[in-house]
Amino acid sequence: MIRVTRLLEVKDLAISFKTYGGEVQAIRGVNFHLDKGETLAIVGESGSGKSVTSQAIMKLIPMPPGYFKRGEILFEGKDLVPLSEKEMQNVRGKEIGMIFQDPMTSLNPTMKVGKQITEVLFKHEKISKEAAKKRAVELLELVGIPMPEKRVNQFPHEFSGGMRQRVVIAMALAANPKLLIADEPTTALDVTIQAQILELMKDLQKKIDTSIIFITHDLGVVANVADRVAVMYAGQIVETGTVDEIFYDPRHPYTWGLLASMPTLESSGEEELTAIPGTPPDLTNPPKGDAFALRSSYAMKIDFEQEPPMFKVSDTHYVKSWLLHPDAPKVEPPEAVKAKMRKLANTFEKPVLVREVE
């Protein structure tokens, strides 16, 4: 029997920001977990709360204006929320590494990349100057930078965007963190370089056996890198499941919308891509009931009155939608989504259990 060890567990996390316009409820009761060696992708539109969630784990949210309303962030069983800034400095980099969105601004332009990598080592390990430089060269080689002995002495402006992102990944891995948070690491890169970085991250995970939280708005990216997916909308997780469950048995209308709006290689080029109507809600005054109801063509009366609970579809698949209630009418997802579901119909065993969970 394989023993799965839980690395991270986020319980009922709620984070708000105080602004002149009122309290912005950026995260509203988020729950998820991550096991050792696993990759979890958190997906959603801009403003859904993905980056705030990742920054909360690292405790990088500026306070004020941000503050934790409630919840726990358990890393190896220890709650990070009450830790002081000094205590968190021993966690950041050493236990949890982070790759930020834009490699162009993540590096100090006046400092050689080798020195920026060795700074991480000096902070978290007792290591000599020579050993640190050797380790920096090894890390650059690990992330696929050619001639690392030479390039370790170069400045960021001497690297392309893709190579800079590789340097940022090397910095994040320098102290061998148990968890790596990648916050849209391919957003600022062109498509071919994106593919290389994604391939690199898959390769690195096999080599160093780290757990990864991958933040993205691109479902196409998710299919390549993740084991499980959490779909976020308006500060809440509305659906979570394995990659196959999210792509080939999605149950939430928002997930349907994301999948239907995604182009595929099978597209003839003649059909129009589906767009999700409307805009995300204003979280200074979150809507009553289901936050997605105003944008959903499947919304029922109860969606505007009561917030839906989580419904369990399988041991790994949970959905926050009244459509899964036994009394709800049976509805069909958009044709573009049904086509994807048919594609894997023979290999994917559909769960039959649907019940409400606490």
From Swiss-Prot:
Keywords: ATP-binding, Cell membrane, Competence, Membrane, Nucleotide-binding, Peptide transport, Protein transport, Sporulation, Translocase, Transport. Pfam families: ABC_tran, oligo_HPY. One of its GO terms (cellular component) is plasma membrane. Its EC number is 7.4.2.6. GO terms for molecular function: ATP binding; ATP hydrolysis activity; transmembrane transporter activity. It is a peripheral membrane protein. Disruption phenotype: Inactivation of the gene results in a sporulation-defective phenotype. Disruption confers resistance to bialaphos. Its main location: membrane. Induction: Positively regulated by TnrA under nitrogen-limited conditions. ATP binds at G44, E45, S46, G47, S48, G49, K50, S51. Residues 8-259 form the ABC transporter domain. It catalyses: a [peptide](out) + ATP + H2O = a [peptide](in) + ADP + phosphate + H(+). InterPro entries: AAA+_ATPase, ABC_Ni/Peptide_Import, ABC_transporter-like_ATP-bd, ABC_transporter-like_CS, Oligopep_ABC_C, P-loop_NTPase. GO terms for biological process: establishment of competence for transformation; peptide transport; protein transport; sporulation resulting in formation of a cellular spore; transmembrane transport. It is found in: Cell membrane. Gene3D superfamilies: P-loop containing nucleotide triphosphate hydrolases. Part of the ABC transporter complex OppABCDF involved in the uptake of oligopeptides. Probably responsible for energy coupling to the transport system. Required for sporulation and genetic competence. The complex is composed of two ATP-binding proteins (OppD and OppF), two transmembrane proteins (OppB and OppC) and a solute-binding protein (OppA). Belongs to the ABC transporter superfamily. This is Oligopeptide transport ATP-binding protein OppD. It comes from Bacillus subtilis (strain 168).
